[in-house]
C-alpha cells in the first residue's frame, strides 16, 4: 500500500507494532517515514498522529490497514481476552485514527479515509467470530463516518479484500488446517475455489483500488464497501 502511494507521488507516514520490521521497511525505502505504534493503544495512536502530521505537514488520506486474524475456534472456545484483542486491533484502531483525522479533514474541507474490512465482513465466517464481527463493524463505522463527514467534502469508503496471497494467509491456512484436521493444501484449494475467479488476491489489487478511491477519479464515491475478492461465493 505504501509503495503504491509513493509511486503515485504521495508522501507517506506508516506505523508498525514490530520495531524490527518497521526499521527494515524504512531502511529499504529512504523516502518513507514512520513510527512504532500499537494502533489499539489510544496514547500511542495520538503520538503517532502528532508525529505524522509534523512530518507530512498535513493530512489528505488516512488508511486504516492494521489487522490481526484472531483465534480460529468455535465460539464456545474463544476467551473474552482473545475476543477483545481481535476487536482492539481490527476495529478500535480504525475508530482511534478516524477520531483524530476527522477534525483535520473537516476543517480543510477535503480528504479521504479508507477503512479495511474483508469478505469476512460480507459473509458469516465459521470459527472466526471475533474477526468477522470486527469486519462487519468496520462497514458500519465507514457508513456512519461518510454521513458525518460528507457535508464537509470528506469521503469515507471501505475495501473488503478476499484471501490475499502472502505470509498472513499462510498463517490463516495453517490455523484452519490444524483446527479441522485437513491438510494445508486442502484448505488452500478451498479458499481458491471459494471465489468465482479461482485465485487469491494480489496485494497490488487492493492498493490500486485505494489509489483510485482517494484520487480525483473517485471524487464522488463515498460510503461504499468495495470487494476486491475475485467474487467470493462463500466462506
Ranges and model annotations:
Residues 69-72, 123, 199, 210-211, ...:
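Short C-terminal tail/terminal secondary-structure segment
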